[in-house]
Regions:
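C-terminal structural segment of proteins
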Residues: 1-192
Length: 192
């Protein structure tokens, strides 16, 4: 199913990985080595949008290889979820997936990470939506506002416009689950 964010005239394919969505949400770093030495990329900068060169999925330079992926320590141990919405329970790419992690102080959001899969050519993060949640009370209204902000530039095509509303509902659900500390079970699928 095609992209609703970050697409170009040359490519509307979506990135299929679940792990990359989680790594994007956790602010992972990618260590690479090549002919000019070693360098480190923020995971958000590792994958690229298609633009006019959709054959290039990453920002690796010629002859570079990934040597390590680093996960920084975070306080998301009990307030996280990964929600994967797909056509069937097994062997299916996500129509929409959401990695959500919250650090709460009481019912206030101190820190938040939110990444989407199945919606763009790369794992999708919008730091403006995350910033809008910081300091807010963890409520459905706050989560709905963040979803609206994150999807403000979403563009559906005839066959996939439903993904915008699916993503909106999924974001609210994932953030609500993370706030409650109840990760989504992959054996049951509740959206509303």
């Amino acid at each position: 199913m095609h992209a609703i964010l970050g697409a170009s005239e040359a490519c509307i394919a979506t990135h299929p990985s679940d792990m990359c969505v989680a790594l994007a949400a956790l602010d992972a770093k990618v260590h690479v080595t090549g002919p000019t030495g070693e360098r480190t990329l923020a995971f958000a900068d590792f994958h690229r949008l298609p633009g006019n060169t959709p054959q290039r999925d990453t920002n690796l330079q010629p002859n570079e290889i990934v040597t390590a992926v680093e996960l920084p320590p975070q306080g998301f141990a009990s307030n996280y979820t990964y929600l994967k919405i797909r056509d069937r329970l097994s062997y299916a790419f996500a129509l929409v997936s959401i990695a959500a992690a919250l650090e709460l102080e009481g019912d206030r959001i101190k820190e938040v990470r939110l990444a989407l899969g199945g919606v763009a050519h790369k794992p999708w993060r919008d730091t403006a939506a995350e910033a809008a949640l910081r300091g807010q009370t963890a409520t459905q209204a706050a989560f709905t506002n963040a979803a609206e902000l994150l999807l403000r530039d979403a563009k559906g095509y005839e066959h996939n416009s439903f993904k915008i509303e699916l993503a909106r509902l999924g974001i609210v659900r994932a953030l609500s689950q993370a706030a409650r500390g109840t990760p989504q079970s992959q054996s049951r699928k509740n959206i509303a």
